[in-house]
Amino acid sequence: MKLRNVEPRFLKAYNILMDKFGLFPFTYDMAEKVLKDNYENVNEVLSKLADAGLLEKTAKKEDKRKKIYKIKPLTTEKIEKVSKDKLIGLLKQGADLIRTQVDYKVLLLFLFFKAISDKYLLKVEELKKEFEDLDEEDIYVLANEEILELYDVEGKKLYVWHEVANNPEDFINALNKIVEMNKEKLSGLDELIKRTGLPTLFENENRHIVQHLINLFSRADFSEASYDILGDAYEWTLNYFAPTKAKEGEVYTPIEVSKLIAHLVEPKDDEVILDPACGSGSMLIEQYRFAGSNPNIVLVGQERNDVTAVLAKLNFILHGINLKDAKVFIGDSLLNPKFESFIXEVKGTGKADKVVANPPWNQDGYDENTLKVNEKYKDIYMYGFPNKNSADWAWVQLINYYTEKKAGIVLDSGALFRGGKEKTIRKRFVDDDLIEAVVLLPEKLFYNCPAPGIILILNKNKPEERKGKILFINASNEYIKHPEVKKLNKLSDENIEKIAKAYKEFKDVDGFCKVVDIEEIRKNDYNLNVSLYISPIEEDEDVDLGEVYEELNKLHNEYLEKFEVVKGYLEEINGLIK
């Protein structure tokens, strides 16, 4: 609709009404209560908005003389092509709108719904050109197979964004219907919708925020946005809210750490990649990306939190990953690894080629009695049970059991040197020559923990020249300051490449990495603390003696000046006392 001829004061009235009523109908009396402080002639305001196409008015059924009003969404021309920067800008606006009032997952839901709607409609247009003889319903059925089912064959109704965005009730019904039509792929999404409180947001004091979000997304066309752009936007949203959610206990692995692990475990075509603590799926997605363009790779994840597991599914979809090749199971992997039967269907052994994970650090409550709930505890936890204060080495054993080739695990650095039961398990891993490398990461990489983490690389197929040895990489200085979050650090592409290069070359580099014989580790009582074997070289600072002298001379003169001032004050005070 054209807004050029609408006076700013009437647009202000539009915003006031939108904030108060959203898309819900209201009467003249209701509008007057909201506008009377700013406008003398409310009737004129409503007429101007109606003339501009910003307000819809209909007669009451019981009394034709009285009108019912309803705000029309303020839309502009669609963005023809959404670049990554434009999409991130849109999401930043959305993030500013919701702040702490609305669950950030609503933003992810809207991104998902709008993106698949636009992609679906683009596919419909492509299919119409390809199959000119087919009627529209048959085209919709074909599109259902290509994207997700958004057309209800029985009800003969299409559930896409632009069909329902102007009606709150239809909007919620559409989301629920999409879940119903895609039960296997989107199982759990209905629960996510409930947990975000989205159905009630249209009815409470935050409804204007939700309506503004709908208007915001309605202005963008995602149909030609690549899945890389959409996936990056989804990841950006998770990353943007990570500092806040970390305070509430949610864990998010920085994407750079996931990239580094991909460079270390090197996922390839025709492999099954497992993450038994997959969170929102970011670690698995980075393995997929590393393997090339549209790789023939199967991603398998398990996540204890049901809502987070749904976020992983949406993440896969927006990255263009077919959910036939990406499965997420819900449950506690340490006690009930549900993924095994699926992996067995794919490759027979029930074990993955590569395993990657950032399991909860120092997770308590997983002692011998608890872990024996797992039917395969004798095989999985064959090296022993950790104490109840930290499940780190329970996770390492689980991952080792389900790994055929190589694994990359992010852990708290304390797992490398703590004693007791953990040391007993660690000793077995060292003696059996399962550990290929240990990488000490910089501090302040993780949102919920300032301490440095480590990456443990397990390799069941060590090359002959690496057998009986472990590579220690001290990457504690390999970081840049985080560009968006104060007090945090970040791995740059150069940092990642340097660490990956050191791992591939597997040789000593002064102050950075060292290849250590297992015998030396035994002498150190199986302590794997990276700093014990390699420390960064402290660079000598160049000192300009002339500059130092000038600075000292300056400070000395300032001292003398202030001394004379203070001395004068003291003499004055002394004179007054006498």
From Swiss-Prot:
The keyword Methyltransferase applies. The keyword Transport does not apply. It catalyses: a 2'-deoxyadenosine in DNA + S-adenosyl-L-methionine = an N(6)-methyl-2'-deoxyadenosine in DNA + S-adenosyl-L-homocysteine + H(+). Signal peptide: none annotated. Keywords: DNA-binding, Methyltransferase, Restriction system, S-adenosyl-L-methionine, Transferase. GO terms for biological process: DNA restriction-modification system; methylation. Belongs to the N(4)/N(6)-methyltransferase family. The type I restriction/modification system is composed of three polypeptides R, M and S. This is Type I restriction enzyme MjaVIII methylase subunit. It comes from Methanocaldococcus jannaschii (strain ATCC 43067 / DSM 2661 / JAL-1 / JCM 10045 / NBRC 100440).
